[in-house]
């Protein structure tokens, strides 16, 4: 009798196990509800070549508080544009990729070692990292003296190169202006001569008309 009374329980267990197995593996393929398309990520650096990149920590001088404030830790780069040849300094925070510094390195800019620390250096720049041009005083710190020297050397090379370009352009513009003035002077010298020749021709024509108008004897 005991064996008979246990049969329904066994059957119920078998049905539950079978149902559970069917729930676990139905063989159905579920398609995703939303399909995510690949989005091309642009950084604005696609048309530029990196000529130097170093890990560092950047600070800016807060004029109101008269103290240095950290801008972020990441990689500082010198980027050269393939078309214009202009070189800018860009630094992004390593974790968020937020821009800490973004400015051109131009003629007249200078960089110098920070007082009392040969791993740091400072410079002034018209920075655009916040979406508008601001006069900033930056200080950057590197892990080694060698990296700091490499940064300063490249900074100076770029600034000097831009200064030479400006001097060359000024010289070219001056030469072009002088050439234009010379041409104008030559043209002004020609005008009196041309005018005299025209007067002679006019006089000759008038004389001929006069001779033709005189009746013959």
Curated annotation (Swiss-Prot):
<feature type="region of interest" description="Disordered">
    <location>
        <begin position="1"/>
        <end position="32"/>
    </location>
</feature>
<dbReference type="InterPro" id="IPR011993">
    <property type="entry name" value="PH-like_dom_sf"/>
</dbReference>
<dbReference type="InterPro" id="IPR045255">
    <property type="entry name" value="RanBP1-like"/>
</dbReference>
<keyword id="KW-0509">mRNA transport</keyword>
<keyword id="KW-0007">Acetylation</keyword>
<dbReference type="GO" id="GO:0006913">
    <property type="term" value="P:nucleocytoplasmic transport"/>
</dbReference>
<feature type="domain" description="RanBD1">
    <location>
        <begin position="29"/>
        <end position="164"/>
    </location>
</feature>
<feature type="region of interest" description="Disordered">
    <location>
        <begin position="160"/>
        <end position="217"/>
    </location>
</feature>
<dbReference type="InterPro" id="IPR045256">
    <property type="entry name" value="RanBP1_RanBD"/>
</dbReference>
<dbReference type="GO" id="GO:0051028">
    <property type="term" value="P:mRNA transport"/>
</dbReference>
<keyword id="KW-0539">Nucleus</keyword>
<keyword id="KW-0906">Nuclear pore complex</keyword>
<dbReference type="GO" id="GO:0005777">
    <property type="term" value="C:peroxisome"/>
</dbReference>
<feature type="compositionally biased region" description="Acidic residues">
    <location>
        <begin position="14"/>
        <end position="26"/>
    </location>
</feature>
<protein>
    <recommendedName>
        <fullName>Ran-binding protein 1 homolog b</fullName>
    </recommendedName>
</protein>
<dbReference type="GO" id="GO:0005643">
    <property type="term" value="C:nuclear pore"/>
</dbReference>
<dbReference type="GO" id="GO:0015031">
    <property type="term" value="P:protein transport"/>
</dbReference>
<keyword id="KW-0653">Protein transport</keyword>
<keyword id="KW-0811">Translocation</keyword>
<feature type="modified residue" description="N-acetylalanine">
    <location>
        <position position="2"/>
    </location>
</feature>
<feature type="compositionally biased region" description="Basic and acidic residues">
    <location>
        <begin position="181"/>
        <end position="217"/>
    </location>
</feature>
<dbReference type="Pfam" id="PF00638">
    <property type="entry name" value="Ran_BP1"/>
</dbReference>
<dbReference type="GO" id="GO:0005829">
    <property type="term" value="C:cytosol"/>
</dbReference>
<comment type="subunit">
    <text>Interacts with the GTP-bound form of RAN1, RAN2 and RAN3.</text>
</comment>
<dbReference type="InterPro" id="IPR000156">
    <property type="entry name" value="Ran_bind_dom"/>
</dbReference>
<keyword id="KW-0813">Transport</keyword>
């Amino acid at each position: 009798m005991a064996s008979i009374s246990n049969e329904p329980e066994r059957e119920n267990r078998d049905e539950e196990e079978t149902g559970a197995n069917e729930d676990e593996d139905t063989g159905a393929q579920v398609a995703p509800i939303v399909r995510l398309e690949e989005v091309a990520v642009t950084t604005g650096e696609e048309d530029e070549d990196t000529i130097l990149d170093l890990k560092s920590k950047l600070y800016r001088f807060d004029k109101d508080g008269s103290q240095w404030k950290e801008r972020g830790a990441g990689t500082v780069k010198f980027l050269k544009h393939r078309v214009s040849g202009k070189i800018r300094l860009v630094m992004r925070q390593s974790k968020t990729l937020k821009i800490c510094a973004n400015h051109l390195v131009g003629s007249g800019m200078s960089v110098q070692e920070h007082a009392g620390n040969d791993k740091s250096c400072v410079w002034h720049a018209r920075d655009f990292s916040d979406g508008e041009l601001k006069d900033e005083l930056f200080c950057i710190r590197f892990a080694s003296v060698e990296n700091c020297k490499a940064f300063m050397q490249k900074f100076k090379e770029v600034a000097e190169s831009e200064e030479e370009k400006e001097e060359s352009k000024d010289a070219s513009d001056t030469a072009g202006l002088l050439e234009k003035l010379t041409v104008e002077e030559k043209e002004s010298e020609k005008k009196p001569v041309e005018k005299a020749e025209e007067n002679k021709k006019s006089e000759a024509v008038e004389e001929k008309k006069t001779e033709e108008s005189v009746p013959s004897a």
